[in-house]
């Protein structure tokens, strides 16, 4: 809203970079190889700075530091659970103190509009960390009335060294989603940040130290997937790996985990989420929300509503209004408060998306607006809408991860369920209708980890998120998000005489 935007402090459009090395044991290190790589401002294509390029040797150092911090009797293992919660709250307070700086740095490195970085990403980071801070001393085992003269109870113990590999589309937020539950439950972390967007997560490393987390509890290695990421996934002394990214890389992570030490795996992968517009939907709201569902974050959302199914009797009106809305979308400098859409994250994504647009045209979808680059420098793409999309087209099956909307026509509710579920993905789905029966029927019939009814992209730290099918395994957020970070231990004790 305009009121919220006016409350956002003005950004420094050239935020200084303080942290561009590898963070191990609460200290900054160059890569063992001394190699660096550039991180680029996607608005201009210019290099922001060089960053230390971590590889297997650096991951090994980080894992050793984490393992040492997790030894029995260490300050971290001996710490009261309530104090782990206090540290997480302290970290959230420090992020809030530096919120304006972090939001500007996120925009510089990722390209998302600064107003969104400040109001959405940073807000959700704080809420996530504070939510998990509250869980630190409240997630615990049970006593169990076992048969015989025995006393039995369970402990929820930390898994140990957790490898966490985070993506470039929500760098700070995905860092919080990973750190919150891992640290609340007493684990130690080796995190690999995306090479496109390493800067904000590395700055948070400084705040982790300032908050008072013991050395080695959190270690952060910037680097590339095939080197640093692969080293984490196949490491024999990493107990668990959590990955957010593409389904293609998800396969590699699961294989690496299986062929090494069978480490626990949670995956949050791609999607091709159906957004179903019934003919009785509130049309103004449905058009705006379907636009938001696809175009938010430059279309770079794993759960984007990227197959918009519209019932035939409102199809023409919906298409016409969606095209008008896409044409009015403001693309430009992400530091300008009027901007709705910034650049794609890098040249690779930019070219890939333009390739998908070309394939849509070649396969016979109707290009209704957009379709090309939106500026002569940087990685900006025009908001693009395709109509008359058929299920078999590449743009209807594959994740584009860009500002390209596919609109498909359907007749009946039974038909749309079959078509919506006919995908290898199952991350999210949405339904717009005023009919309670249709909403309830569809929410149960759709194969997806999240179903939104008359809304889209509504997240709360309290509600779990994750995928069916090839969109991943495990859940993040909520109480469910703690399960992946704990082992349940049963302790059974012989007693002289059991009494009820």
Curated annotation (Swiss-Prot):
Q: Which positions does UniProt annotate for NAD(+) binding?
A: 245-250
The answer on whether this UniProt entry bears the keyword Mitochondrion reads yes
Annotated GO CC locations: mitochondrial matrix; mitochondrion
Enzyme Commission code(s) on record: 1.2.1.3
What's the domain of life for this entry? Eukaryota
Q: Which residues carry this modification: N6-acetyllysine?
A: 35, 56, 61, 142, 351, 358, 366, 390, 409, 411, 424, 434
Q: Which GO terms describe its molecular function?
A: aldehyde dehydrogenase (NAD+) activity; carboxylesterase activity; NAD binding; phenylacetaldehyde dehydrogenase (NAD+) activity
**SUPFAM superfamilies attached to this UniProt entry:** ALDH-like
Could you tell me the keywords of this UniProt record?
A: Acetylation, Mitochondrion, NAD, Oxidoreductase, Ubl conjugation
Where is this chain's protein located in or outside the cell? Mitochondrion matrix
Query: Quick one: a GO biological-process term for this protein?
Result: aldehyde catabolic process
Q: Which residues form the active site?
A: 268, 302
User: Which residues of this protein are annotated with the site description Transition state stabilizer?
Assistant: 169
Task: Name the top EC class.
Answer: oxidoreductase
| Record PROSITE patterns | ALDEHYDE_DEHYDR_CYS (PS00070), ALDEHYDE_DEHYDR_GLU (PS00687)
**Pathway connected to this protein:** Alcohol metabolism; ethanol degradation; acetate from ethanol: step 2/2
| Keyword field contains Protein biosynthesis | no
User: What reaction is this protein's catalytic activity?
Assistant: an aldehyde + NAD(+) + H2O = a carboxylate + NADH + 2 H(+)
Report the family membership. Answer: Belongs to the aldehyde dehydrogenase family.
Q: How does it assemble?
A: Homotetramer.
Could you tell me what this protein is called? Aldehyde dehydrogenase, mitochondrial
Q: Which organism is it from?
A: Mesocricetus auratus (Golden hamster)
């Amino acid at each position: 809203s305009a009121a919220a935007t006016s409350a956002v402090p003005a950004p420094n459009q050239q935020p200084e970079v303080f942290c561009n090395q590898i963070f191990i044991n609460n200290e900054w290190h160059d890569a063992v190889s001394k190699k660096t790589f550039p991180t680029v401002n996607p608005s201009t294509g210019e290099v922001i700075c060089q960053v230390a390029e971590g590889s297997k040797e650096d991951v090994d150092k980080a894992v050793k530091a984490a393992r040492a911090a997790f030894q029995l009797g260490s300050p971290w293992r001996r710490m009261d659970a309530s104090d782990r919660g206090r540290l997480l709250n302290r970290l959230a307070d420090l992020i809030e103190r530096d919120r304006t700086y972090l939001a500007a740095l996120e925009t510089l490195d990722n390209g998302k509009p600064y107003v969104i970085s400040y109001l959405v990403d940073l807000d959700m980071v704080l809420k996530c960390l504070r939510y998990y801070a509250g869980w630190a001393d409240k997630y615990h085992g049970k006593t169990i009335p076992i048969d015989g003269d025995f006393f039995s109870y369970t402990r929820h113990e930390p898994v140990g060294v957790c490898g966490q590999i985070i993506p470039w589309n929500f760098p700070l937020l995905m860092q919080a989603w990973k750190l919150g539950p891992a640290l609340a439950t007493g684990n130690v972390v080796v995190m690999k940040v995306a090479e496109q967007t390493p800067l904000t997560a590395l700055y948070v490393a400084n705040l982790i130290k300032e908050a008072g987390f013991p050395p080695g509890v959190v270690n952060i290695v910037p680097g590339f997937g095939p080197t640093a990421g692969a080293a984490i996934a196949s490491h024999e002394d990493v107990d668990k790996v959590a990955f957010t990214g593409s389904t293609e890389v998800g396969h590699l992570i699961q294989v690496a985990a299986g062929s090494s030490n069978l480490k626990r795996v949670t995956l949050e992968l791609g999607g091709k989420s159906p957004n179903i517009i019934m003919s009785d939907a509130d049309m103004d709201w449905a058009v705006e929300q379907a636009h938001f569902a696809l175009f938010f974050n430059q279309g770079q959302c794993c759960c984007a509503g990227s197959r918009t199914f519209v019932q035939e009797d409102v199809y023409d009106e919906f298409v016409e209004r969606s095209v008008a809305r896409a044409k009015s979308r403001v693309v430009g400098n992400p530091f300008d408060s009027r901007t709705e859409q910034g650049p794609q994250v890098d040249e690779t994504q930019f070219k890939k998306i333009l390739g998908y647009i070309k394939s849509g045209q070649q396969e016979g979808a109707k290009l209704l607006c957009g379709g090309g680059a939106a500026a002569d420098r940087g990685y900006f793409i025009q908001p693009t809408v395709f109509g008359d999309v058929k299920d078999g087209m590449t743009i209807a099956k594959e994740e584009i991860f860009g500002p390209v909307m596919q609109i498909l026509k359907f007749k009946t509710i039974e038909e749309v369920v079959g078509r919506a579920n006919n995908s290898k993905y199952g991350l999210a789905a949405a339904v717009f209708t005023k009919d309670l029966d249709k909403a309830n029927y569809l929410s149960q019939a759709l194969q997806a980890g999240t179903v939104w009814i008359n809304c889209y992209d509504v997240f709360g730290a309290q509600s779990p998120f994750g995928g069916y099918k090839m969109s991943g395994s495990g859940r993040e957020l909520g109480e469910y998000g703690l399960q992946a970070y704990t082992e349940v231990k049963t302790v059974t004790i012989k007693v002289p005489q059991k009494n009820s």
